[in-house]
UniProtKB/Swiss-Prot annotation:
It catalyses: adenosine(2503) in 23S rRNA + 2 reduced [2Fe-2S]-[ferredoxin] + 2 S-adenosyl-L-methionine = 2-methyladenosine(2503) in 23S rRNA + 5'-deoxyadenosine + L-methionine + 2 oxidized [2Fe-2S]-[ferredoxin] + S-adenosyl-L-homocysteine; adenosine(37) in tRNA + 2 reduced [2Fe-2S]-[ferredoxin] + 2 S-adenosyl-L-methionine = 2-methyladenosine(37) in tRNA + 5'-deoxyadenosine + L-methionine + 2 oxidized [2Fe-2S]-[ferredoxin] + S-adenosyl-L-homocysteine. Pfam families: Radical_SAM, RlmN_N. Signal peptide: none annotated. Its cofactor is [4Fe-4S] cluster. SUPFAM superfamilies: Radical SAM enzymes. Its EC number is 2.1.1.192. It comes from Streptococcus pneumoniae serotype 2 (strain D39 / NCTC 7466). This is Probable dual-specificity RNA methyltransferase RlmN.
Length: 361
């Protein structure tokens, strides 16, 4: 299986063209075709020699993904189901924000974190995505717009799709560097957010990288007992260890951390739990921000339901009164398979039902 050309960082591309006996500037030309003109084949790179195009075709593919399903919401959200070269499926989501187009990318096939409310955790992790497969998601979103004559550019990236980004650390870091590169997509570092469920040692590593991207932490509970019951990762990295790493990150980078908090009715949404959360955040209040997220129900996790508006607002008001920075996050794609992993899960179920029907006509 040939790798995607998008797997190569710019410096690696320069090294590759030199190995082919070409001048270094050819790497700039290839990158311009890929990231500025967004071609989908090497043959479209008209200022390259036939010999170099043949070498590119022999060693790489441009885009390793196939578009399987697209769902468009009335609010402009678009959800994509892509097929990888090995037949596995991943999701990508485009959200229209007031500040631009934001794409949420997937980093793994399934997930090992063990969040009991998430459709992504229904199957254990099968593999990591490589850098090229993550970059390719954005390129196909851009292709989708180009085919419709829409001259819109992806401006923001959130690494919050299926999988734990810090469990695929090197590929995610390479991805961030690729999309941030001035010669590539040139997406500003502060327009990129990487999320983690709480791998404390990787948060420390990320602080030391010196990249200026944003960090989000999926918290979802204010104490160890509750967090361990809904997120098994907390058993390995309890809140004390997690917050020590977060404080190290803030001290090292002087950057704000966003906390994701999904609102589960009568599970984690009481006023008492809001007070616990405020206490947990008091030492980093000035450099923390809480996203209160309405829950998208998943049929496989019917023990959970969405918090009613009254409980969400009471939680919000309590945090605010304690000086916390928080917001109730806007919902996107409520009329499509909106929850993370839901489109993929539902598609796999339908494919399974078709197979059963074929076996038992």
């Amino acid at each position: 299986m040939k790798p995607s050309i998008h797997s190569l960082a710019h410096q690696t591309m320069q090294e590759w063209v030199l190995e082919q006996g070409e001048k270094k500037f050819r790497a700039d030309q290839i990158w311009e075709w890929l990231y500025r003109k967004r071609v989908q084949s090497f043959e479209e790179m008209t200022n390259l020699s036939k010999d170099l195009i043949a070498k590119l075709n022999d060693q790489f593919v441009v885009n390793p993904l196939k578009q399987r399903i697209v769902q468009e919401s009335a609010d402009g959200t678009v959800k994509y189901l892509f097929e990888l070269p090995d037949g596995m499926l991943i999701e990508t989501v485009l959200m229209r924000q007031h500040y631009g187009l934001s794409v949420c990318v997937t980093t793994q096939v399934d997930c090992n974190i063990g969040c009991t409310f998430c459709a992504s955790d229904l199957i254990k992790k099968q593999r990591d995505l490589n850098n090229g497969e993550i970059v390719a998601q954005i390129m196909l979103v851009q292709k989708y717009f180009a085919e419709r004559g829409q001259d819109e550019r992806v401006s923001h990236i959130v690494v919050m799709g299926i999988g734990e980004p810090f469990d695929n650390y090197n590929n995610v870091l390479n991805f961030v560097c690729t999309i941030n590169d001035d010669k590539g997509m040139a997406i500003g570092a502060r327009h990129i957010t990487v999320s983690t469920s709480g791998l404390a040692h990787k948060i420390r590593n990320f602080a030391d990288e010196g990249v200026q991207v944003n960090l989000a932490v999926s918290l979802h509970a204010p104490n160890n007992e509750l967090r361990s019951s809904i997120m098994k990762i907390n058993r390995a990295f309890p809140i004390e260890k997690l917050f020590a790493a977060i404080e190290y990150y803030i001290e090292t980078t002087n950057r704000r951390v966003t906390f994701e908090y999904i609102m589960l009715n009568e599970v984690n949404d009481s006023v008492e739990q809001a007070l616990e959360l405020a206490e947990l955040l008091k030492n980093i209040k000035k450099l923390s921000y809480v996203n209160l997220i309405p829950y998208n129900p998943v049929s496989e996790h019917d023990q959970y339901s969405r918090s009613p508006k009254e409980r969400v607002l009471a939680f919000y008001d309590t945090l605010k009164k304690k000086g916390g920075n928080c917001v109730v996050r806007q919902e996107y794609g409520t009329d499509i398979d909106a929850a993370c992993g839901q489109l993929r899960s539902n598609t796999m179920k339908r494919d399974r039902q078709k197979a059963v029907a074929e076996v038992n006509p």
